Amino acid sequence: MFVQRNLTDSVPTPEGNMHYVKQGSGYPLVMLHPLGTSTWAWSSVIDSLSQHYTCYAFDMLGHGESDDPSRHFNIPDYANALDHACQILNIHRGHYVGNSVGAVLATEMAASFPERLDKLVLVGCPVMDYRTAPQRLQEGAANYDENGLPKPRTFEEAKAAGTSFATPQPEWIEAM
């Protein structure tokens, strides 16, 4: 009889310890959260997905319970740190799902380490038209302070911008 075990731990990377939640059994599913969130962003779907996969939800460095990186990080830096963590955890190949900036990181993983990804699922992946990108980036930058952190919002604004997930459907899981 299989007993499902949930594990919360951290794994060392050259840039600091990366926190993760491991849940379920089966083929590895690496879950990458949106900017400014953490593993809790997956809390509404991880129970369902972990019935079919070994889910690894990571707090990217500088988020949640992970260490802050010691220097400025860009997307390729996050990908290298994540790959390092995955190799230590013996996740040599798996499915990757990313939400928002997590989707950008997942695409970087696919580009930098294609041998490590079986399937790639992108949720709310930011895509910009080159003609409108400068204006959109400038407007978006107004939401962040000089340290690159989101500016405080009212509760109503935060609630309106909150992340919500659809209820996982069996056909989605079968398609993975």
Can you say where each PLM-predicted feature lies in the sequence?
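A generic "structured core" feature
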Residues: 29-32, 56, 96-111, 122
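Conserved alpha/beta-hydrolase catalytic His-Asp/Glu region
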Residues: 131-138, 147-176
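Conserved catalytic-core motifs of eukaryotic protein kinase domains, centered on the activation segment
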Residues: 41-43, 66-72, 131-134
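Flexible "cap/lid" loop of the alpha/beta hydrolase fold
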Residues: 107-112, 117-151
